[in-house]
């Protein structure tokens, strides 16, 4: 016989670089003008977008500056968690002796519960990045499972049958989310 217990808690914090904030990219690529001091500004002379950095995608290989990248770039932070509880009990052995050998038996039970969640960065959830949008999600399920197996020896060491056995097995599974 054996008894087992497993607990697992996996947490992932994913940091993604190299994506752009679409709202800031729109601002940086939107209307712009050169102010009186010769500095490019976002918006119009009548409505300057404070803090915005105009983005130049067509000015040659060095036109996209570090300042532009810092303004439009975003670091995304997602969180994922999965938790598992698993308990099993099993018993095996021979029940009694038959003429062709012992009647083998095995039975067991398992209870398992899994749950988890995913929390994307707020910008990812809003769909305002150049990457794929994703929504927060969570869920879980539990399972109760029973099994029984029998190995029935029928014939042994005969001229026409070295070994003849019948194996019988049954399993019952009850999932909390279906079936």
Q: What spans do the regions from the language model cover?
A:
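Surface-exposed, low-complexity loop segments enriched in small/polar and acidic residues
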Residues: 1-144
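Short loop/turn motifs that connect adjacent beta-strands in outer-membrane beta-barrel proteins
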Residues: 96-104, 155-164
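Structured alpha-helical segments in the cores of large, soluble enzyme domains
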Residues: 140-157
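Transmembrane beta-strand segments that form the barrel wall of outer-membrane beta-barrel proteins
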Residues: 163-176
